[in-house]
From Swiss-Prot:
UniProt name for this protein: 13S globulin seed storage protein 1
Database matches in Pfam families: Cupin_1
Transmembrane segments: none
Cupin type-1 domain boundaries: 49-331, 390-539
Length: 565
């Protein structure tokens, strides 16, 4: 009976321990107040918005990192940090994690994405087999034999010295010969024992290598994919395509997952900045003597792309932790004399990546194992089996579609559940020639509009009833629209396409015109009295547009005739 109680108690402890690994991302986290979102509300007195491009560029061996200036009123209000990464063909964005959650949109290209989640198992295995290097085995064998021989010679010299001190030369000679024969047998026995042990060690290492490499999930990414990441989760990206891989990433510095301050910090596990430490130290001293704004901007750059966290550990500690590696490997772990930056040119990197249909098949099998309900059991299935990407560039999956005006694709926690853990979402909008979106506002989120194609005109109106932005936008620009600000966009002659990244997992927009608009939900009499118009005009105002959010441009009869010819 006591044995059963002990086993039951041990099982409970194991379950609690496993749950603790994944607790920061459990759904219950939503009940926690968004401390950071409330902390910076006093900074949201926005009088003027600007459509901006990256203000700083950081070059690496195989790519470029471009950073927006987040020390503007709208960026401070939203708590956003925006970064664009360009990875050249064959380039590898080194593994890193952040103190804040973020969401990435792949603008162009294709590649491979890796995700490492604490507490999740290594469920992927490469097909290629590794051969333990023969030269390394020989080197270890020669080194061990040399050490063994040295110890044997030292024992021989010590014994001979003791024998000579006894006085009788014949006895010494006889005993020395006897000792020599015994010591020879001892050395031979020790050598054979060492050889067998070394052989077993090499055999064990060889068997370990022959089983192949095991790792956590990797998946293929392409243009239109949205990739989220919680704080502290390691991700890396490899461009195995023929063109540049371009992505835009939005960090939520005000998230409750950020326990530090209002700044975003990236922690790299490899690599090093192209600048030397002395250069960075010199620049830091120069900034301290300069303006506060310049100092803040440069500090933000360094926090995002400064150093490898292993650089700060001493060699002795790393050698104790990572056994069976030489000093050269330890030096490379720390990034000593590595000036390639954080996007490096990969060599002989061949990954077995499951295709999308294989991922779906594996996910369906997991659902069937859970009884087909799709619900998690509260342990690793709560997080480890979640999707880490969703494509928003598929017309067949559009949430709003107007064949003559455009479409809207939304990714939120309903179709990508991991977004519920990080409180972020995205929306991809395509407007055809001269089409219009809005006016509308975000009920519960700030949004960052990043233009991916074309150009158009945008108007934004703030809480004081006056325009805070009225200008054209073009590809590569970001416009931050605070919560509640009404925005309308009209595409140019080449159309307009953009992605909106928002800091709520289920961001809701409220249109002012159209079939699902707020005006459509208000009685005609209320509209008539509100605007001091007749009920007939109020009815026209309410029902003038039958489309949903995406509108055809108004055209006069003459304009229609000109288009026909």
């Amino acid at each position: 009976m006591s044995t059963k109680l002990i086993l039951s108690f041990s099982l409970c402890l194991m379950v609690l321990s496993c749950s603790a690994q994944l607790l920061p991302w459990r759904k219950g986290q939503r009940s926690r107040p968004h401390r950071g979102h409330q902390q910076f509300h006093h900074q949201c007195d926005v009088q003027r918005l600007t459509a901006s491009e990256p203000s700083r560029r950081v070059r690496s061996e195989a790519g470029v990192t471009e950073i927006w200036d987040n020390d503007t009123p709208e960026f401070r209000c939203a708590g956003f940090v925006a970064v664009r990464v360009v990875i050249q063909p064959g380039g590898l964005l080194l593994p890193s994690y952040s103190n804040a959650p973020y969401i990435t949109f792949v603008e162009q290209g294709r590649g491979v994405q890796g995700v490492v989640v604490p507490g999740c198992p290594e469920t992927f295995q490469s097909e290629s087999e590794f051969e333990y290097p023969q030269s390394q085995r020989d080197q270890r064998s020669r080194q061990s034999e040399s050490e063994e021989s040295s110890r044997g010679d030292q024992r021989t010299r010590q014994s001979e010295s003791e024998e000579f001190s006894r006085g009788d030369q014949r006895t010494r000679q006889s005993e020395s010969e006897e000792f020599s024969r015994g010591d020879q047998r001892t050395r031979q026995s020790e050598s054979e024992e060492f050889s067998r042990g070394d052989q077993r060690t090499r055999q064990s290492e060889s068997e370990e290598f022959s089983r192949g490499d095991q790792h956590q999930k990797i998946f293929r990414i392409r243009d239109g994919d949205v990739i989220p990441s919680p704080a502290g989760v390691v991700q890396w990206t490899h461009n195995d395509g023929d063109n540049d891989l371009i992505s835009i990433t939005l960090y939520d510095a005000n998230s409750f997952q950020n326990q530090l301050d209002g700044n975003v910090r990236n922690f790299f596990l490899a690599g090093q900045s192209k600048q030397s430490r002395e250069d960075r130290r010199s620049q830091r001293q120069t900034r301290e003597e300069g303006s506060d704004r310049q100092s803040r901007e440069s500090d933000d750059d360094e926090a995002l792309l400064e150093a490898n966290i292993l650089t700060g550990f001493q060699d002795e500690i790393l050698q104790e932790i990572f056994r069976n590696v030489d000093q050269e490997t330890i030096s490379k772990l720390r990034g000593d004399n590595d000036q390639r930056g954080f996007i490096v040119q990969a060599r002989d990197l061949k990954l077995r990546v499951p295709e999308e249909y294989e991922e779906e098949l594996q996910r369906e099998r997991g659902d069937r194992k859970r009884g087909g309900s799709g619900r998690s059991n509260g342990l690793e299935q709560a997080f480890c089996n979640l999707k880490f990407k969703q494509n928003v560039n598929r017309p067949s999956r559009a949430d709003v579609f107007n064949p003559r005006a455009g479409r809207i694709n939304t990714v939120n926690s309903n179709n990508l559940p991991i977004l519920e853990f990080i409180q972020l979402s995205a929306q991809h909008v395509v407007l055809y020639k001269n089409a219009i979106l809005g006016p509308r506002w975000n009920l519960n989120a700030h949004s960052a509009l990043y233009v991916t194609r074309g150009e158009g005109r945008v108007q934004v109106v703030g809480d004081e009833g006056r325009s805070v932005f009225d200008d054209n936008v073009q590809r590569g620009q970001i416009l931050v629209v605070p919560q509640g600000f009404a925005v309308v966009l009209k595409a140019g002659r080449e159309g307009l396409e953009w992605v909106e990244l928002k800091n709520d997992d289920n961001a809701i927009t409220s249109p002012i015109a159209g079939k699902t608009s707020v005006l459509r939900a208000i009685p005609v009499e209320v509209l008539a009295n509100s605007y001091d118009i007749s009920t007939k005009e109020a009815f026209r105002l309410k029902n003038g547009r039958q489309e949903v959010e995406v509108f055809l441009p108004f055209q006069s009869r003459d304009e229609k005739e000109r288009e026909r010819f």
